Amino acid sequence: MRVEEFDYTLPEERIATYPPAERGSTRLIVLDRAADSITHSVYASLHERLRPGDLLVLNNSKVIRARLIANKPTGGRIELMLLEKHEGVQNLALYRGRLKVGDRLLAHGAELTVEALPDHGVARLSCDTANLTELFEAHGSVPIPPYLKRDAEEVDRERYQTVFAELPGSVAAPTASLNLTDELLEKIKAKGVDVVHITLHVGLGTFLPIRSETFEEHVMHREFYNIPESSAHKIGEAKARGGRVVAVGTTVTRALEHAAPRLLDSDFSQEVSGEADIFIYPGYEFRIIDALLTNFHAPRSTVLMLTAAFAGKELLRRAYQEALERDYRFLSYGDSMFIS
């Protein structure tokens, strides 16, 4: 299967560059796979799509301050976007500007060194005074996606974070749940839907396009995840009794499907941690999730391919066409899709 099959024209005016005026005031396109149907609704009606006994799974990872401006000794400005959070000596970062191996950058009293350039627009950096994560957390800003083509503003500090974000570590938000409000979550629970949290720290692959021509050539990025014991137990229990597991976002989907062998083991009742490197595309057989809430994704992206694997290529193609014709808003701050 070729990557070009997942290309489409996304007009720039269809990209939501700011969040909606009120959290949760977005639209929702609804795909029913069994009926091969598409209907149009609003995000605030999500609870009406759920059933008593469903299990809603959320990603509680919190976006860290991952964007930093550094300068070359000559004065040139370099924008850096941290791509992974760990306590090691070196970290990967996206960069805007011109860099070569050995270049030194200055940022808030620290000196950074370009140790390697492992991919287009990606640098491996070291820091002379502290670990890079601490430097970014102290002086960085919200890492809104590069395709928004603007600097982060005050509104992004609140709105590029979910209302239940808890554990710091992501360099991008789990965007499917950006429009979930406390009020909507209460309506969902009141309907008899159980809600559990997992953690997957969103990292490198969110910003890097697929450069290969075929799926087989693509090397998927790794993202750390943790499924607490209580959540793992409820997921396994839901599958055992035939209940629906509803994944809020592709990050939740990747974590659950990667952990499927342990979650489906009837003798297993512990937390699950790992590094999800699973590449989900059409032909994949889902073992855990039964419904998916997600956003409209960029062309040729791995998350678009995951969505196509779950919805079916043709149904998803029709849904995207209808969404474009009806002026839906796309990408992180945009409208959403519910697939059952």
Swiss-Prot record:
- InterPro entries referenced in this protein's UniProt entry, alphabetically: QueA, QueA_dom1, QueA_dom2, QueA_sf
Keyword S-adenosyl-L-methionine attributed = yes
User: Into which EC class is this enzyme placed?
Assistant: transferase
Keywords in alphabetical order, please: Cytoplasm, Queuosine biosynthesis, S-adenosyl-L-methionine, Transferase
Quote the catalytic activity from the record.
7-aminomethyl-7-carbaguanosine(34) in tRNA + S-adenosyl-L-methionine = epoxyqueuosine(34) in tRNA + adenine + L-methionine + 2 H(+)
Q: Where in the cell is it found?
A: Cytoplasm
According to its UniProt record, the EC number is 2.4.99.17
Choose any GO biological process term that the UniProt entry carries and state it: tRNA wobble guanine modification
- One annotated GO molecular function: S-adenosylmethionine:tRNA ribosyltransferase-isomerase activity
Q: Which Gene Ontology cellular component terms are annotated?
A: cytoplasm
Key word Cytoplasm present in the record?
yes
Q: Which domain of life is it from?
A: Bacteria
Query: Pathway it acts in?
Result: tRNA modification; tRNA-queuosine biosynthesis
Sum up the protein's function in the record's words. Transfers and isomerizes the ribose moiety from AdoMet to the 7-aminomethyl group of 7-deazaguanine (preQ1-tRNA) to give epoxyqueuosine (oQ-tRNA).
How does this chain assemble? Answer: Monomer.
Give the family from UniProt. Belongs to the QueA family.
Supply the name of the protein: S-adenosylmethionine:tRNA ribosyltransferase-isomerase
Query: By which gene is this protein encoded?
Result: queA
